[in-house]
Each structure stands twice: as structure tokens, then as C-alpha cells.
Amino acid sequence: MQFSTFQQDLNTWQGSSLIFGIVEEDLKNQLQKINFIIDSKLLLEKINQKKFNGEKGKILNFDFFDQRLQTLKIIGLGESKNINSNDIKNSLADVIRKSSDKEEKISILFPWELINSPEEIQSFGESARLSAYKDNRFNSKRDDKKVLNEIEFLNLNKFKNINFNETEYICEGVELARRLVAAPPNSLTPLEMSIQASKIAKDHGLEIKILEKNECEDLGMGAYLAVAKGSDLEPKFIHLTLKSTSPVKEKIALVGKGLTFDSGGYNLKVGASQIEMMKYDMGGSAAVLGAAKALGAIKPDGLEIHFIVAACENMINGSAVHPGDVIKASNGKTIEINNTDAEGRLTLADALTYASNLKPDSIIDLATLTGAIVVALGNDVAGFWTNNNMMASDLKTASSQAGEELWQMPLQKSYKDGLKSHIADMKNTGPRAGGSITAALFLEEFFDKNIKWAHIDIAGTCWTDKNRGIHPSGATGYGVKTLVQWIKNKR
């Protein structure tokens, strides 16, 4: 899907589908804006019949079969003094989602004078495109419905020079993440994930290194490889690098959990554990690769960015790791495995150590790590932990700009006692209470403490069972926009 703008005289506009935003005050004068395409007096009568006065979130649909304008969607924006971009994005998403299989091109005309910045308008474009997303790869039946392939913004006035290139790049990154998360585990294997990473490298000029099992053994990655032992599929350790063409002012590592399927191992997922949904246990790596795709196109100067994914499956066979085994991570720490279903943190242990050895200024890891974070924050908000107050502030700002909810959680040091082992340096899980916190405390043991670090648990946000805001039901691609915005803010 592409974005376009129309800045000419509206009387020359040739579109057939229009979304028109309207505030509560003085409907008659506002409707004059579209008098070029429809009799505004007649339209006002129809609107009054429906008792509509521009209330926030209310939507009116009109179909015209005997005019050039075929469809008109009117979105109520509420009082002009209280206009809210997030409300607009959600209403726009709702309209676009319902229209995306009926129209090939949709035009949008809002009271742009009430919008504060071009970034807000870009976010409207983002909302429109991402809400129209459909994934029919695994459906044998191909319908003949239309596909929305263009969003046009009319008369942007003071924002007439707006550029939607970066918006398109970010949407492409989110869409890649959604496709990866939604792909079934017999389709998205560790090998396939490495192929997808190689394609990103080829398309955008990134360097790539894929470590095979024997190379991971040489690096002492006993935690990551312990998880992979039960699968017939070889693990793939993926390292993408986006280099800067100018002197590097900051080096960053983004690390994603990459379990392409998680059975739970010998602590098998049963009952309400939703084993059939464990294809999305690589949501963190999907966000990292989606960010790599977007940033590879944007090419932020002065930054060297490393994208790291330890991809594997957690399965059961005669070689699989046992509950009670003691393993050694690549930083030399020994770990007693008291739960094979807490495998993501084991793969991240070696991935974080690897990232730390690159000597970055900061590391962010993303993972569908704990059910505890879903209990704490639900499905709309991800939790994050960090060892640096400035990083916390920067992430909150970036997530707010990106429209992805993020809530800071405590690194409660007293909870570390729950990870003590009688026979090893630590256990891989603590008690049930505070489970997402002890998971973060576990990860904190695997990188240089002088590095700024944040851990984002996206277990609740990477998937939605129903349409939610800009997300159609299914994979959300959560995390891509926040990561990209956080990087963009450093330019």
C-alpha cells in the first residue's frame, strides 16, 4: 500500500471514496468543504436525521450509486479543543478495516488546521495501512474482493510537504513482524527465520552472520543449546549489523527471543497453556527483524545497530534437557534448570552475553517471556525493566510517540533470592509470585553492568484474538514501532 497527497483544487479531485472528519461545532460550515463533490445542504439533512453532531468516535456511512462519489464515511472527532490523535487513529482504523476489501483507493479529508504536527498525520497513515492488513498466505481459497492499495490525503495545507517514506518503511517492518509471528511452526523454522534475516541484509545492505550449532558450541553457548537439544531442527544464531556511513556516536544491540515453537519441554504445556499458540513465542525476534527491515531502509546516520536472534525450538526427544539439569552459559555462570518451560531466558542469556561482548552503549531485549506480565498488565500494555533512568524516560517517550503502551516495572533486588540454587550459581525460575520480575533479574546476570539495558516483556501484546485499535485480529507486530522511534529520536 502506498500513501499519496492531493494538493490541487478539490473541484478537480477524481476520487470515489472519501473519509471526512468533522468536529462538533458548526456542522453546516464544515460540510461546505465537501460541497465540491456532494450537495452539502442535502447531506446536512441526512446527518440531522441520524442525530449526528460530530460526537467523538461516532461514524456515519453513506453509499451513493448514482454519483461519482460512491462512498462517504464521516468520522466524529468531538470538540475541537479536545481533539485527540489516538481517538482519530482508532476511529480511522475501524473505518479502513471495514472498507479495505471494498475499495482500492480511499481518500481522507480532515480539519488539518487542528492537527499539531506532520508526525501526527504520518501516524494516521500508519494507522490506516496497518488496520487494513490481511494475511491470507495459508488459505487455499483466494477471494475476488478488492485490495486497498492507496491512501490519499486531501488538502494538507500547512503540511503539504509531508513525506510518507519513513511511514511506509515502518509499516513494512510491522507487517513483516506480523507475518513472522502468524506463520505456523512448520513454516517458520529456525532455518526459515535465518533466510528472512538474510533477505533483509540483501535488500538493505546490512552485514549478516549466522552461527551454526558447532560455532555456538565453540562460544560456550550452553544455555541456548540446552533448549535446542530436544529438536530435530538445527538452531540458527542470527546477527545482523547496520553500519553507519559517518563516524559512530552510539552502538546499540537489539536482542529478540526466537523460539519458533515452544512445547514447554518436559515441563510440557498442558491445559490452559495454549500449546497450539506457541508459534508466537518468537514475537521478540519478529520485532527485532521488523525493526531491522525498517531501519535498514531509514538508515539513521551515526548509529551502529546490531540485531541478534537466537532461533531454535523447545521440543522433547531422548536428547532433550531434563528438569534438574545443570548447564553453563557462555559467560561461565551455571544454571540449574528447575523448569524447562522457562526456556526463553536461557536462550536470551547467551544472546545477551554475545551482545555484551560487542561492547554496545545500550541493549534492548524483547521477549514473550512470562505469563505473569499478562496477569499484571493484560493484553494492551507491555512491561519493561531497565537499569538506567534516562533509558526509561527515552523508552516511555518513544512508545508514546509510536502508540504502543509500555509500563515500567521494578527490578526488585530482594526477589533475586528466589533464584538461588543449592547446586549451581542460580536457578532459571523463582517462585510464582513476581514471576516477570525474577525473569528480568535473571537476564540482568548476562551482560556488562556498565551497559544501559532494557528488557521488554511482550507476552500479552504480540497477539490479539479480536480487532483492537490499529490491529486486526492475530499478530500485532508489537515492538517494531517503539524500537524504530527510539532509534529515530537519537538522530
Curated annotation (Swiss-Prot):
How cofactor binds (record note)?
Binds 2 manganese ions per subunit.
Which Gene Ontology cellular-component terms appear in the entry? cytoplasm
Q: Name one GO molecular function term.
A: metalloaminopeptidase activity
Q: Which residues bind Mn(2+) 1?
A: 262, 341, 343
Per the annotation, which location comes first and is thus the protein's main one?
A: cytoplasm
The UniProt catalytic activity note for this protein reads: Release of an N-terminal amino acid, Xaa-|-Yaa-, in which Xaa is preferably Leu, but may be other amino acids including Pro although not Arg or Lys, and Yaa may be Pro. Amino acid amides and methyl esters are also readily hydrolyzed, but rates on arylamides are exceedingly low; Release of an N-terminal amino acid, preferentially leucine, but not glutamic or aspartic acids
State the UniProt keywords alphabetically. Answer: Aminopeptidase, Cytoplasm, Hydrolase, Manganese, Metal-binding, Protease
> Which residues of this protein are catalytic?
269, 345
Pfam families, alphabetized: Peptidase_M17, Peptidase_M17_N
- Provide the cofactor list for this protein: Mn(2+)
- What does this protein do, in the record's words? Presumably involved in the processing and regular turnover of intracellular proteins. Catalyzes the removal of unsubstituted N-terminal amino acids from various peptides.
Q: Which HAMAP family match?
A: Cytosol_peptidase_M17
What's the name of the protein?
Probable cytosol aminopeptidase
Q: Which organism is it from?
A: Prochlorococcus marinus subsp. pastoris (strain CCMP1986 / NIES-2087 / MED4)
